[in-house]
């Protein structure tokens, strides 16, 4: 019993290496003192604003975000968290996109970021602007009224309301606009005041229809416009490669290199889906003969497969072998659940030697842009915390392997050491169980006394005798099942082909046999009376 207790103690100690201490979630516990310096991630802010604008694209915050992107401004009223605050504090706080903001900046919050929100002074609500537009257009037909006959995606309320009030600033319905654009407010002094508080200058040349005009050499297609085109593409085909790339770039808060919006747009419009409506501006601007320098600076991803090539690769892999991720792309054509680039990449990171992964190997070449970018961990080299163990049917070293269960994957040296000792002691337990069964079988061996006590049944069919059914048969069956389970479990561990885990099994069996093997030669004591 002391030996068994000791083994159980060591197994518990080994398993405890997997416990990880959690951290305070400042979104749900914003009053916790440790949350003072918490910063709500930019990727989450962008996702929340996109959530709001996906539901109501005519909201003022959508226009403000686009204008700030065009001016490449991220401070003051253009700070993304301040833009989110414009909606969640004053306009549409009940929308789902505001859920995290409201929790983070709830009453009693100690998060300093909440006190730095630079909301637009006297910004009218969406419905107040809409009401003023309808009132103005009912009194007088003006340019812009045709865009807001109904409140939908074509009715950009802030732009239309500002256009009407710039034309007729003394109208009573423009009182809200006058307050918003007052010289003492932060809108008038911001980089986005042009077109909202002051007339926007008209460009001398239309570089979309005349991209070969010398004056278009320095023309820059704004990030906001490029993002709008990408959104157009992804609304039609959300499984496209560019949609995944944009998500990854947003998560890393990267807007340069392959993550530049114009470069992401180029990935689709130059190589993948040039015929889609979202590529019309790109194709005009970068047509043959264009002098626009931005077109020559597109940093497209080298050897990026097309959406349909990726899907074909996924189908071929999953037809040969069922792997994690295949269930997302089970149909005969891509769907919204089939995010082809991440799925294809995860399959190839797990089985890089498959022939279907030739495109992935080229795309993730160490000399390519994707491999050397900030988003490489999503598609080429996953971090240890997120990496999928590679199935290698040959002896190998390393710590990243599945051990019996999908959730048992050591990702640190400490976790791997704990796994090694857990397997080692389990192998010792296996030898102990075999020894215990051997001892019991010898103690239960029928003898002369059993025959005299009628504990044996004579059988002409078997030409001998056998014991009656007793509780011993139940114990024998249970011990046999335990022994079989242990032996198969250890066999499966050895079949990971991980050298260290293989020798954990061998070492455990060796030590267990040394400790308990001799007891298998146990002979029950025989007295004179037996």
Swiss-Prot record:
Its main location: membrane. It is a single-pass membrane protein. One of its GO terms (molecular function) is copper ion transmembrane transporter activity. One of its GO terms (cellular component) is macropinosome. Residues 1-22 form the signal peptide. The chain crosses the membrane at residues 491-511. Keywords: Endocytosis, Endosome, Membrane, Phagocytosis, Signal, Transmembrane, Transmembrane helix. InterPro entries: Cop_transporter. The keyword Manganese does not apply. GO terms for biological process: phagocytosis; response to bacterium. It is found in: Late endosome membrane. The cytoplasmic domain (residues 431-481) is responsible for the endocytosis and localization of the protein to endocytic compartments. Belongs to the SLC31A transporter family. This is Protein P80. It comes from Dictyostelium discoideum.
């Amino acid at each position: 019993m002391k030996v068994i207790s000791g083994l159980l103690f060591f197994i518990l100690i080994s398993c405890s290496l997997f416990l990880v201490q959690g951290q305070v979630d400042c979104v749900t516990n914003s009053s916790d003192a440790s949350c003072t310096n918490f910063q709500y991630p930019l990727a989450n802010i962008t996702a929340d604003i996109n959530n709001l604008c996906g539901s109501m694209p005519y909201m003022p915050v959508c226009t403000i975000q686009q204008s700030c992107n065009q001016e490449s401004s991220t401070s003051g009223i253009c700070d993304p968290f301040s833009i989110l605050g414009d909606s969640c504090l004053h306009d549409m706080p009940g929308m789902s996109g505001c859920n995290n903001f409201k929790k983070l900046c709830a009453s009693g919050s100690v998060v300093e970021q909440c006190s730095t929100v630079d909301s637009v002074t006297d910004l009218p609500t969406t419905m107040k602007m809409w009401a003023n537009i309808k009132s103005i257009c009912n009194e007088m037909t003006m340019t812009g009224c045709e865009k807001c006959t109904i409140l939908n995606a074509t009715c950009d309320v802030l732009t239309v309301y500002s256009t009407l009030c710039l034309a007729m600033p003394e109208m009573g319905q423009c009182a809200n606009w006058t307050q918003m654009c007052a010289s003492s407010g932060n809108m008038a002094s911001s980089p986005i005041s042009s077109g909202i508080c002051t007339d926007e200058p008209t460009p001398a040349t239309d570089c979309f229809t005349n991209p070969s005009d010398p004056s278009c050499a320095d023309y820059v297609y704004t990030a906001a416009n490029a993002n709008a085109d990408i959104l157009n593409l992804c609304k039609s085909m959300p499984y496209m490669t560019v949609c995944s790339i944009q998500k990854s770039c947003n998560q890393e808060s990267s807007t340069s290199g392959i993550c530049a919006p114009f470069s992401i747009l180029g990935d689709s419009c130059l190589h993948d889906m040039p015929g889609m409506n979202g590529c019309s501006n790109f194709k005009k601007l970068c047509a043959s003969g264009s002098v626009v320098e931005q077109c020559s600076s597109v940093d497209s991803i080298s050897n990026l497969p097309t959406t349909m090539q990726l899907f074909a690769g996924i189908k071929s892999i999953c037809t040969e072998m069922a792997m994690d991720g295949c269930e997302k792309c089970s149909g005969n054509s891509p769907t919204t659940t089939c995010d082809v680039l991440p799925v294809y990449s995860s399959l190839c990171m797990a089985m890089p030697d498959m022939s279907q992964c030739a495109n992935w190997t080229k795309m993730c070449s160490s000399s390519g842009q994707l491999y050397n970018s900030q988003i490489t961990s999503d598609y080429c080299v996953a971090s240890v915390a997120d990496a999928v163990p590679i199935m290698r049917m040959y002896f190998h070293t390393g710590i990243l392997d599945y051990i019996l269960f999908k959730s048992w994957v050591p990702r640190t040296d400490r976790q791997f050491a704990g796994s090694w000792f857990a397997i080692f002691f389990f192998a010792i337990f296996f030898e102990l169980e075999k020894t215990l069964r051997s001892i019991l079988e010898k103690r239960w061996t029928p003898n002369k006394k059993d025959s005299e006590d009628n504990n044996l049944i004579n059988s002409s069919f078997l030409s001998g005798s056998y014991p009656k059914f007793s509780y011993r048969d139940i114990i024998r069956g249970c011990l046999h099942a335990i022994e079989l389970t242990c032996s198969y479990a250890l066999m499966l561990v050895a079949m990971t082909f991980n050298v260290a885990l293989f020798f954990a099994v061998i070492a455990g069996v060796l030590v267990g046999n040394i400790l308990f093997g001799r007891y298998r030669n146990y002979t029950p004591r025989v007295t004179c009376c037996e």
